[in-house]
Amino acid sequence: MMQNLPFEPEFEQAYKELASTLENSTLFQKKPEYRKALQVVSVPERVIQFRVVWEDDKGQVQINRGYRVQFNSALGPYKGGLRFHPTVNLSILKFLGFEQIFKNALTGLNMGGGKGGSDFDPKGKTDNEIRRFCVSFMTELCKHIGADTDVPAGDIGVTGREVGFMFGQYKKIRNQWEGVLTGKGGSWGGSLIRPEATGYGVVYYVEHMIQHASGGKESFAGKRVAISGSGNVAQYAALKVIELGGSVISLSDSQGALVLNGEEGSFTAEEINTIAEIKVQRKQIAELATQDAFSSKFKYIPGARPWTNIAGRIDVALPSATQNEVSGDEAKALIAAGCKFIAEGSNMGSTQEAIDVFEAHRDANPGAAAIWYAPGKAANAGGVAVSGLEMAQNSARVNWSREEVDSRLKKIMEDCFNNGLSTAKEYVTPAEGVLPSLVAGSNIAGFTKVAEAMKEHGDWW
């Protein structure tokens, strides 16, 4: 499928990861017609590309590229975030949209898959510049989205502030209030738990991994948890780990890693909140590293990721920054440090080489002796799940309580885990005592659900 495409390394990686999983299972033996479905689902239904012209504070005209990849609507309206970052290109958005199809399928909610964004960099921009950019971006995007067509959300570089600016422009142009974006403010249609959802969700997912692998004897209590990133996902994953009795031993950002000095202790909830405050101001964690309260307890390593810089044992790893942030060598280092569970809070957080290392170790070691890897499309589905719950609340013009949303999130993550587990057992036969492959189970479960819907719609035959 890749030979007639332009060079799109990120999308090619995502496609090959799914295709190899399906090939290495018994799915195509049992249902060979699904090979055709894979060819069809790998081509987006629509790709929208446009210019975004806006004025900076000096009165100068600035030009950026805007995109929306409407990948698949078999299960519902296109659903996926908007990313504002200078690295954004069509390959990255196609990879994210492709992953989003199957992630959304795993939630059990009626959502298709899509992704969008721009190569605009919000860092260093004033509020007025960001507002002017968002207005220009939405002026074009509004022609292609709607509550029953395509419902974007936030992603890297797109917080509640940007969602608000874009929602306001959509409302002005279309003269209607509808749930066309998720991640909205709580006072105007947003859902409680939405900012926390991805981070909380990945921890809830790993809870089930720990309980299954230990036969119900273990939990997060006493676990040393290495986390990368320091945005929403990392912050709320860290807070939930601390709440459940675990120790958070690292965070990071694009400039470097902040790791615990020594083998005892943890980030506290107050320290996580301090990091959250500087991130709202778009500052780097390096600025905290020199403060007395942090320098005595933590070590800052410029230009590094945390995985090979942590003293002592690592029980759980949660990559929560960006794609391909765990390499093959770092995967081996995590195993050497005693890591037993790795779940991606970020999308495609591990390179294919790293996934191969994790899966080979799981295949070669029975039960609790192995590292158990969970892919982002399953482990970080909590964010889009609560976006789906926000859509449901908007449609019904109701607001659910924090407890109601959190309860539904926990159930969705439990179902997501059990679905991947049972599907892996059905289509992939491991050696005696070996844990099932969650990457295989999640890929197959998401793919078969979408493929069946597409077949019934006449998209392939």
UniProtKB/Swiss-Prot annotation:
The active site is at K115. CDD domains: NAD_bind_2_Glu_DH. Keywords: NADP, Oxidoreductase. GO terms for biological process: glutamate biosynthetic process. It comes from the Eukaryota. It catalyses: L-glutamate + NADP(+) + H2O = 2-oxoglutarate + NH4(+) + NADPH + H(+). It holds the Pfam family ELFV_dehydrog. Its EC number is 1.4.1.4. Homohexamer. Belongs to the Glu/Leu/Phe/Val dehydrogenases family. This is NADP-specific glutamate dehydrogenase. The lineage of its organism: Eukaryota, Fungi, Dikarya, Ascomycota, Pezizomycotina. The gene is GDH.
